[in-house]
Amino acid sequence: MSYYRKRLSPISPSQPIDYKDTELLRKFITERGKILPRRITGLTSKQQRDLTEAVKRARLMALLPFVNQEA
């Protein structure tokens, strides 16, 4: 019988996700600029919602590109 380890979130639950912290936000988007899904990031559902909102806000404020065409 195998046991599954509980996955820990890469961000502590007490750490706020801020739209101005672009270095943190870039860890959770692809090289094309798409937001990575929760099953890949390992975030909790609330953190994923906050991350999505922060990325979208950062895009509107021109801190992150909508589409990254470098690739």
Curated annotation (Swiss-Prot):
GO terms for biological process: translation. Keywords: Ribonucleoprotein, Ribosomal protein, RNA-binding, rRNA-binding. One of its GO terms (molecular function) is structural constituent of ribosome. SUPFAM superfamilies: Ribosomal protein S18. One of its GO terms (cellular component) is cytosolic small ribosomal subunit. Part of the 30S ribosomal subunit. Forms a tight heterodimer with protein bS6. Binds as a heterodimer with protein bS6 to the central domain of the 16S rRNA, where it helps stabilize the platform of the 30S subunit. Belongs to the bacterial ribosomal protein bS18 family. This is Small ribosomal subunit protein bS18. It comes from Microcystis aeruginosa (strain NIES-843 / IAM M-2473). The lineage of its organism: Bacteria, Bacillati, Cyanobacteriota, Cyanophyceae, Oscillatoriophycideae.
